Amino acid sequence: MERFLRRLGVPERCFELIDTVIATCEQCNAFKPVPRRPRFGAELAGHFGDVLMVDLFYIFGMQFMLMIDEAVRYKVAALLANKDGKSIMKCLLLNWIRYFGPCKCITSDQEGGIKSDDFALACDRYSIHRKMAGSDDKGQHTTTGLVERHIQLVKCSSLKCEMQCRQEGLPVDKEDIVVECAMGQNFQLEYNGYTPAQGVLGHN
């Protein structure tokens, strides 16, 4: 927030109120996540398109898939019609591959649709290697921590945005809220001083 306020030329004295404003924000406090130690499993892919991490999540009674590039953290959320292999691959084709091309490797948890023969055939057609995440002794995935953390970010921001829209009486579709919250984070989150959008598109 401080970075955006500086871009707007807000007076310095206003920065002292940031913590107070956040602490009294009804939408922020309503969906404040429980603090916990994050568990990441990224393997530091060298370039955009090397490794694409995918996972499914549910919100507002709908099923979505989050796709995130491991190298630059650029992500896309899309509504998923079904959990079978054909539906997952079609979602990938329409929302990722047709814009950025096929990735070299797809990493996911032990999702049935991604493990299916239909999905395997589609991956072979595009020369995509599948990598299934393993689990530790506690049953937690060992290599999908990155995408799971970003799902938390998307869900939290979507819940806040939906509550704000509802209170203001704005007729916004809930699917649009989830998709746009994921998209907006490509322009807001920073890694080593650059946003994911800058890493992929060259600008914000």
Segments from the language model and where they lie:
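Short, charged amphipathic recognition helices of the HTH superfamily
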Residues: 1-5
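Retroviral integrase
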Residues: 8-157, 191-194, 202
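Globin-like tetrapyrrole-binding proteins
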Residues: 137-140, 150-182, 188, 192, ...
